[in-house]
Amino acid sequence: MDYVHSRANPVVKHLIKLATQRRERLRSKQSVLVGTHLIESALDHAFTLQHVFVRDGSSQHNEVATLIERCEAQRIRMTTLSGELFDAIEQMPSHTGILALFEFPHVEDFNATRGAVLIENVQDPGNVGSILRTCAASTVEQVWLSKGCADVWSPKVLRAAMGAHFLLDIIQNVELDALPDVSIAVTSLGDRSKSLYDVKFERDLVLAFGAEGAGASDELLARASHPLHIPMSGRVESLNVAAAAAICIFERERQLLASAE
């Protein structure tokens, strides 16, 4: 295994940019997976890793050693990095000592019939990742994200989603006027809004969630065929967008399961 200790190394420079710059990720269509769980999930779902990097000394840990064996069996290129370089790339300490470079898939074809969720202008990486994870736990297969969302392939979103990226078709930088002619259910407090539990969910009804605080844009609300709200006790004003998404997605799931019986 090669050993790299210089920050001047071009691969290291590229990795640091990928870890910190959305522009570099979009330009190269690459990102960085950090930690044993994400790398194991990628391998389990036949996601191609281009290059794996191990922190000097971390190969003695059982989980890392097991992944090294799997990567070697697949002839994935591997390099050892000095602790200083590894930490500069990792950004968010995971204490697992392994990361991977990968090229993320480019999906273009919208397909609401497979189950789709639209995320509009949700900027917190943790919220985006949590919504992705909820989608992966349901029968939703596609997630569409507007340009105003946190970068779906950033290390922070990847970490929050806990491997959900490998189970979903993800379309990012979506313009609302480019969406296909689909029915959209969006959370709203407007006069037309129905209770979530009064909405009849079909598999091709797209669930949409707007930004933290501001909610769905006027443009999205105008497109919505099914504005809805989650009935609450009144003791709190609103729910976190990831919590609201989980409630709505699994009400959809409940109805689809009931209709299939």
Show which residues each predicted segment covers:
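RNA substrate-binding interface of SAM-dependent RNA methyltransferases
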Residues: 70-73, 84, 101-192
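Short, aromatic/basic amphipathic alpha-helical patches
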Residues: 62-74, 156, 219-220
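Amphipathic alpha-helical repeat scaffolds
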Residues: 35, 124-130, 239-244
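Glycine/small-residue-rich loop that forms an oxyanion/phosphate-binding "nest" at active or ligand-binding sites
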Residues: 68-99
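Structured adenosyl-cofactor binding patch, chiefly the S-adenosyl-L-methionine
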Residues: 100, 134-138, 149-166, 218-261
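Glycine- and other small-residue-rich loops at beta-strand/loop junctions that grip anionic moieties
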Residues: 4, 31, 120-121, 146-147, ...
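Boundary-proximal intrinsically disordered activation/regulatory segments immediately upstream
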Residues: 1-65, 149-150
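Active-site/ligand-binding-proximal alpha/beta "capping" segment
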Residues: 185-234
